[in-house]
Every structure is written in structure tokens, then in C-alpha cells.
Amino acid sequence: MNPKTYEALETMQKRVDQIDKDLQSEEIVSDVKKMLELNKERANLIEVVEKFIEYKTIIQSIADAKEILGNEKDAEMIELAKMELSENEDAVEPIVAIIEELLLPKDPNDDKNVIVEIRGAAGGDEANIFAGDLLRMYKLYAETQNWKITMLDANSSEAGGFSQVSFMVKGDRVYSKLKFESGAHRVQRVPKTEAKGRIQTSTATVAVLPEMSDVEIEIKNSDLRIDTYRSSGAGGQHVNTTDSAVRITHIPTGVVAASQDGRSQHDNKDIAMTMLRARIYEAELEKQQAEADATRKNAVGTGARSEKIRTYNYPQNRVTDHRVGLTLNKLDQVMEGKIDDFIIALVNDEQRQKVEAQLQDNE
């Protein structure tokens, strides 16, 4: 193990020991905020610290076995020491790999709920229909993960599907999996309205935004313009006669969020504010990412909405994720929410990129 890594792990272990002592003190027990902070810090450290303790135990066992082999005369004891030495030496590389993976920088948003926005893009009616197909796909996937979906806002298309639809997904580590869905999803198929059977290419864009609290994204009321208007259903039909729909504009950034599907103006304002915080955060994150990529001269994709990430070819029952070069000939299953193969490949690719970035930083 790298000496610097070993030193850093020793520091982490000492910090966990100190936190454990602090959590026993009356001063901390009576301070709920501080206690929560310490527990959160401990939770972030404990997994890698436990693996480090396991690693040190293995190294000590190797040293003990070597000492026995150097001093022992009994044949049976020598044989046992050889077996123990072999087993522990074989265990070193795997546990070091686990520790190195645990030390990779974590996305602070991985545990968050998300807001997903799907928009029909290039392709007119067919793009809107495909946006509806993607919504169904994500709903079915959410069911397999025991996640809860709440619709936030939707503009239905007369031909079917949606020109725009937004929904919240709540559950365990939602962002860690769905964040890879951000980008342009291209579909190739024969539209139902196509009499000559020609294949049309259309696009729907997906944005996956981590839900941000008002503490994480502070927005001044003086920076907001709030407009109210009448909610309308598909085709522009008014569904109520009061100005219950809400549109909020963040004046400094120009970011806009609107909601009309809540039960009241108050509900719609809350929904719009939730979406606004997420969009402001995303805009700032994209700005920082662009600066980081420029500094690194890194040409890899960023998952931006304009980037084509996946192609769904219906005639050939084929789906290709262009970021990892993975093609699955089971589009029918993918559209039923079975997208785990893509997500696992993308998680692994993210880990690989983090390792490469860390190696570059260490050079």
C-alpha cells in the first residue's frame, strides 16, 4: 500500500476513535445538531476504516507466519504457518483494491431524491410520444427499486405523450443510479402515422436533478418574480377558474420553474420552488464542470442535455448506450423498465474515470 494512503487511513481511524469518544460526552449528547453532524461524519468514514483495520490484521498475520517459519522446528507447525502465509498474502491485493475504491471521491448527491424532466425535442409528435414512453420506462424501473414517483408538472401532447413532463423520485440512493439518464435519448422507429413504413429518428431529452433543500440552495425572496395563471389540461382546456398555477423566475440567473398540477396555488408554489432550487444547482454544477473539464482538457462527455447518450432502435429491437459502447438486443425489455445493465455499466465506468483522474492528480 502507498505510504501516503496508509498515513491518510491512520488519520481516518484516529478520527473515528475520537468521534466515538465525543459521542459519549454529555455535552455532545445534549447538542442534537452536533451529534447528527458527528454521526454523519462517522458514517462516511467507518466503512473504509473497518477495511483498513482488516488490512492491518492481514499484514500482522503475514508477519507472524514469517516469524514462525524463521524460528519453528516442528514440521506440522511449519506447514500450518505456510498455509496461513499463503492465504493472507492472497488476501492483500483484493482488500487494497476495495480500500482504494472506497477512498475515491464520492458524489455528495448520490443519496438524494431526484427531479426528472423529460421533453420531446427533435421530431415533433413522435418525440413527444417517445417522451411518454420514457416516463413509463422510468416508472417501471422505479417499481423494481421500491422508489416512489410523484408527478410535478406535465404538458400533454394531442398526439400522445408529453412535450414536457416533470416528476419527483424518492427512495434509497435514487440519484446514484438515475443521474446517468441525463442527456438526449434518440429513438428510431416507424411512427404509427407513417403510411409508407419509413423509419423516423426523433429525440427526447432527460434531465435528472438532485433535490436540493432550502439550506443547500439559499434563494432570496427579493430575487424572485412570481407569476400566477390559470391551470390548463391537454389541448389548453381550463381545469379550474382560479389562478392556481405558479411560475417562478430567479432574476439573477434567469432560471424558471412552473407548476400547475398541485391541488392549490400554495402546492404549486412549493413544487415550483423545489424545481427551481434543483435547476439553479444544476446550472451552477454545469458551469463548474465545464471549468474543470477545460482545466483537465478532458474530452469525455458530461451528461449534458444536448449530448446524445443512447439510441433506441425499434426495428432491430436494439438499444445502444454511446458512453460505454454497450448494445443490448432487448429493447422490448428495456422499455419495460429493465435498465439495470446500463446503470451497472455506467457506475463501473464512473469508477474507472475517478481512478484515472486520481492517478493524473497524483502525477
Swiss-Prot record:
It is found in: Cytoplasm. SMART domains: PCRF. It comes from Mesoplasma florum (strain ATCC 33453 / NBRC 100688 / NCTC 11704 / L1). GO terms for molecular function: translation release factor activity, codon specific. PROSITE patterns: RF_PROK_I. HAMAP family: Rel_fac_1 (MF_00093). PANTHER family: LD18447P. Methylated by PrmC. Methylation increases the termination efficiency of RF1. Keywords: Cytoplasm, Methylation, Protein biosynthesis. This is Peptide chain release factor 1. Its main location: cytoplasm. Peptide chain release factor 1 directs the termination of translation in response to the peptide chain termination codons UAG and UAA. GO terms for cellular component: cytoplasm. Belongs to the prokaryotic/mitochondrial release factor family. The modification N5-methylglutamine is found at residue 237. InterPro entries: PCRF, Pep_chain_release_fac_I, Pep_chain_release_fac_I_sf, Prokaryotic/Mito_RF, RF-1. It holds the Pfam family PCRF.
